[in-house]
Amino acid sequence: MNYFNTLNFTQKINQINKCRFMKKEEFNKKNDILKNKNIVIVGCGAQGLNQGLNMRDAGLNISYALKKNSIANKNQSWINAIENNFKVDDYDALIPDADLVINLTPDKQHHSVIKKLQKLMKKNAVLGYSHGFNIVEFGEKIRKDITVIMVAPKCPGTEVREEYKRGFGVPTLIAVHHENDINKIGLEVAKAWAFSTGGHRAGVLESSFIAEVKSDLMGEQTILCGMLQTASLLCYEKLITEKCNPAYSAKLIQNGWETITESLKHGGITLMMDRLSNSSKIRAYKLSKEIKKILSPLFQKHMDDIISGEFSNEMMKDWENQDLKLLNWRYKTKNTSFETAPVYNEKIPEQEYYDHGILMIAILKSGIELSFEKMIETGIKEESAYYESLHELPLIANTIARKKLYEMNKVISDTAEYGSYLFSESAYPILKEFISTLNKSDLGCALSHQSVNNIELYRINQKIQNHPIEIIGCTLRNYMKKMKAITVAK
């Protein structure tokens, strides 16, 4: 039973609204509450391994519990843990003595894993998640004596480790499941866990399981994964239709997302648009307005289906059906013309990605703003909406730069992958019709310089800079820069 749907209206609003930017003084106790405790991480994939490495470096006692057949077959999780000199054993051997059990297995495995863990966990132990799907959407019931918390780094596991090694961290969301906080220690343990992964150095949001799940699902389905996938396929097809070099076209898109979104990290949509000439900026702005208009109903449907639980219900049916839809979509994507395009070995200058990618920039702007706006309209706070619509975008774009959509879909969770395909199935025909009407200069070659109306340009600049995501983004990015400066100075 979907936990969110069991709440009354006021409870739903309070949970979705929960979001507080925590002060650095709140982490003065560091991770003292977890020192000399037995911490067992279940699963040793990207998040499991890299969070564990950080926590060990922070002075905590970390071991890994894996399934017996994973150990016997020496699978990748076992290799990850052993090669990094961690203690590894099965559930029966490690869970009964654990003070904190952190479940970092894939979403679809959570129910069966949690069922086993609950039978083995000692009284008053703490259970941790990094994504709340199992609690919120599946409605998992946890033993009342067990405290349930969440620490969710807002990036892939590899980035969690790399930022920690640089002496910094990644923005992190923490939460306590208030149905399971009988000893009132949840927040202190979550803070200590976030401190140990380095999250306190980049900024921590105190949120709720519900706010994390609903915003996370919306972001990954739309702008973070679904929009990038749809746009990659359609932009490549558009370039081929215009008789552009297939290898150049593929590289422009594959590396273009990463190059362009790098500007988002430093100055948001404003800086991304400022990288264009004035005439190109005006064109990108107008295209973005049109894209927002035609895609707004689809973004709204995804938000509505996430809030109602319809999305999760349909995806869990696919789990029961051996991932039939997911595997079919994965096969289709793997065999698209973009994924199988030839390699372009020449260098494309950085500015060329902007000058030849007006449409790509318009798609990014419209997708970020739509995703953010739909979350805000639903009651999700601006800080959460920013992290789930803009902040993670360069990290996802980086996966496409490595091995196109194959790499993105391999790195993201199965839940994100399913949602991405679902969005793309609907967005593809809508955007295809729109893109077919565009000018050649919108993608693949530079727009010739045109006369610019000063008043029009001024108004466009004002609208870009004054969008709510730019205002909250400026605040959050400045906070991260200050925290990084303090950390480096130490």
Curated annotation (Swiss-Prot):
Residues binding Mg(2+) 2, per UniProt: 216, 388, 392
Annotated active site: 131
InterPro entries named in the record: 6-PGluconate_DH-like_C_sf (IPR008927), 6PGD_dom2 (IPR013328), KARI (IPR013023), KARI_C (IPR000506), KARI_N (IPR013116), NAD(P)-bd_dom_sf (IPR036291)
Enzyme Commission identifier(s): 1.1.1.86
Residues that coordinate or bind substrate: 413
Domain KARI C-terminal knotted: 208-343, 344-483
Coiled-coil residue spans: none
Pathway where this protein functions: Amino-acid biosynthesis; L-isoleucine biosynthesis; L-isoleucine from 2-oxobutanoate: step 2/4; Amino-acid biosynthesis; L-valine biosynthesis; L-valine from pyruvate: step 2/4
UniProt-recorded Gene Ontology molecular function terms: ketol-acid reductoisomerase activity; magnesium ion binding
Cofactor(s) required, per the database record: Mg(2+)
Superkingdom of origin: Bacteria
Biological processes annotated in GO: isoleucine biosynthetic process; L-valine biosynthetic process
Positions of NADP(+) binding: 44-47, 67, 77, 107-109, 157
Domain KARI N-terminal Rossmann: 16-207
Family: Belongs to the ketol-acid reductoisomerase family.
Stated name of the protein: Ketol-acid reductoisomerase (NADP(+))
Organism taxonomic ancestry: Bacteria, Pseudomonadati, Pseudomonadota, Gammaproteobacteria, Enterobacterales
